[in-house]
Amino acid sequence: MSETTQPAQLKRKLGARHLNMIAIGGSIGTGLFLASGATIANAGPGGALLAYCLIGVMIYFLMTSLGELATHNPTSGAFFTYGTKYVEGGFGFALGWNYWYNWAITVAFELVAVQFIMKFWFPDLPGFYWSALFLAVVFGINALTVKGFGESEFFFSLVKVLAIIVFIIIGIFMIAKIMMTPGVATFANWTKGEAPFVGGLSALIGVAMIAGFSFQGTEMVGVAAGESKDPQKTIPIAIKQIFWRILLFYVVCIFIIGTLISYDDPLLLQAASSENIALSPFTLLYEKAGFAFAA
């Protein structure tokens, strides 16, 4: 009696909302919450905004191209398989290992950033404990089923999105003088000193590298395509929504920070070379608004 062996199939449980939040949650993190202050301090509000817009345009073309490939050929092997199939085996091999190395370094960076963030609230606890705890959480989430992973990512990414929306609302109120905050110069910061473009072309290029790091994670749609429901339908929808939402979040946040905090603010300059979460532009702005507890 012969046995027929069925090849293992991935369970396609990820919908458009999961893909949206996986990409948004992967790209919105320390690049915005911590590094955005350094971009304004180094290149001024105009330079930082221009750098994010330029990188955003580049990401748009990258994402639309990836979306076409993932829609035509959804695969569980991540997007480096497209390099193997459509270019050459060595190209796909190098792309795959570079991508692995990229995220291995990023995860380590994020675990270190967790120490600095948690130290703001729990200064007496060793940072190693927080890194170990969050590493266990990351491992646990990745060990879940596809549906469980998708729902977990949706929830955690939603928290990030809500935090940014609250930040944007408070920032708009401060710019419009609905929330009166002493010492906030608003649009005068765009013409102060060397502003809006500080440091010239070299500063713009340097900040563009930080902006590129910040957008990392948008490509997650290509990684998750092999486990998405009806990829021919969900991938194009997710690609269109993800790019504009992420670009909107970054551009609006950079504009608000550059408008409300001067590029030569001593605290912002310290944030450019400090590991103290208290110097995050988000924390500084909340303190100016009188909501230090929200930081």
Could you describe each region identified by the protein language model?
Residues 81, 88, 120, 238-295:
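TM-loop-TM module centered on a large, flexible mid-protein loop between adjacent transmembrane helices
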Residues 36, 66, 211-235:
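Juxtamembrane interface elements at the cytosolic ends of transmembrane helices
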Residues 38, 50-51, 59-143, 148, ...:
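Hydrophobic transmembrane alpha-helices that form the core helical bundles
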Residues 43-45, 72-77, 85-91, 226-234, ...:
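Juxtamembrane helix-boundary/capping and inter-helix hinge elements in multi-pass membrane proteins
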Residues 1-37, 41-46, 59-64, 76, ...:
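Membrane-interface "cap" regions at the ends of multi-pass membrane proteins
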Residues 115, 128-187, 215-216, 239-247:
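Membrane-interface loop-to-helix entry segments
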Residues 47, 156-159, 222-258:
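Junctions where cytoplasmic loops transition into the N-terminal start of transmembrane alpha-helices
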